[in-house]
């Protein structure tokens, strides 16, 4: 079996879907020596994605999310021979004589189109219906995403397999001495509230700021809030809200961290807060749990499925409830101990090896028969 895997996005985005692609490639290279792989890579990126003789890297000129992608990508692929193409970023090429597996991470753009840029709305909204129609099979990050595909796009349930993701194994408990250099570098004191992720409207950071202001007013000793991640899109309102709420001295923005520094931040935090309006998976929840950090997160999308009984769940529209949950998770020591213990048990359900094995099983089922 010869499998092509579209890894072009890794050059443009190292977080989120880019991390999914990298971990999947690394585990497949370790687990599957019986099949051949073609990694479709951006010609701009010289970084090897897999150190394995059965993995061939083919540089492509066509960039991700380009308006001419459906014209130029099939032309570039026509010179290659493979049985199956895995498109891990929602949209496959329409043309080509090969089986198509797509991964759908979430359907945020259908639930909350106002949370995307006009360009992103055009790319995903205009193509997702055709993508799920031409795909021979679909991998979904969670049961919540599978249910959305069935309900919103009319996909037959048997056409979708749920393959859960996992945190990077580097996320683990660290002692204070190991965290100290990272905290010193960013001038942080341990015990802060932490948000991690892209700064974008879907993450409900403005709601978090409003709830945090209310908590600080009620309890002036509330620790600082650290926003760790990168600026995504439509993020100006976040900075306007910080200024309007007079939180400049309490909120810190820490950008573009390597994963190793995120490990230290999770360990040094008193609490992770992820009040997203929608998540297709929610890796920060598992990353925090793997480090022993209590979690408060939204009850929307996949988060109840991923967090299990190991987090305090909140309605992201109820900012008073969010403030109360943060206060409780900071002050209730028996609850904090329970969340830590349950978090370690919960995160043990997930591994990239399991993700890769289940994905490989889909590859083999798809190529074994022309009938799904």
Task: Spell out what each predicted region is.
Residues 1-372:
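Carbohydrate transferase catalytic cores enriched for Leloir-type hexosyltransferases
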């Amino acid at each position: 079996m010869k499998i092509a895997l579209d890894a072009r996005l890794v050059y443009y985005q190292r977080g989120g879907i880019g991390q999914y692609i990298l971990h999947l490639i690394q585990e497949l290279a370790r687990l599957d020596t019986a099949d051949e792989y073609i990694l479709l890579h951006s010609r701009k990126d010289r970084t090897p994605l897999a150190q394995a003789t059965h993995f061939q890297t083919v540089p492509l000129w066509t960039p991700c999310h380009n308006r001419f992608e459906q014209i130029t990508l099939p032309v570039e692929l026509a010179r290659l021979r493979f049985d199956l193409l895995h498109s891990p970023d929602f949209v496959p090429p329409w043309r080509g004589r090969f089986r198509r597996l797509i991964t759908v991470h979430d359907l945020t753009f259908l639930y909350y189109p106002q949370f995307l840029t006009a360009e992103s709305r055009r790319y995903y909204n205009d193509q997702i219906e055709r993508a799920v129609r031409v795909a021979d099979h679909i991998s979904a990050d969670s049961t919540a995403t599978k249910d959305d595909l069935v309900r919103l796009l009319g996909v037959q349930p048997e056409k979708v397999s749920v393959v859960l993701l996992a945190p990077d194994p580097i996320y683990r408990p660290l002692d204070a001495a190991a965290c100290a250099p990272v905290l010193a570098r960013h001038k942080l004191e341990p015990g802060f509230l932490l948000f991690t992720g892209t700064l974008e409207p879907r993450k409900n950071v403005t709601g978090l700021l409003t709830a945090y202001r209310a908590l600080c007013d009620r309890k002036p000793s509330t620790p600082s809030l650290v926003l760790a991640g990168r600026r995504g899109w439509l993020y100006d309102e976040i900075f306007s809200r910080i200024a309007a709420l007079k939180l400049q001295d309490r909120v810190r923005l820490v950008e573009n961290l390597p994963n190793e520094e995120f490990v230290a931040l999770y360990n040094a935090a008193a609490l992770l807060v992820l009040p997203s309006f929608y998540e297709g998976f929610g890796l920060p929840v598992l990353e925090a749990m793997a480090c022993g950090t209590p979690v408060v997160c939204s009850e929307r999308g996949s988060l109840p499925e991923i967090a299990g009984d190991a987090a305090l769940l909140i309605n992201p529209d109820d900012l008073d409830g969010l403030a109360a949950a943060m206060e409780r998770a900071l002050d209730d020591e028996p609850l904090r101990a329970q969340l830590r213990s349950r978090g370690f048990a919960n995160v043990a359900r997930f591994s990239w090896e399991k993700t890769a094995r289940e994905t490989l099983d889909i590859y083999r089922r798809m190529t074994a028969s022309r009938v799904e």
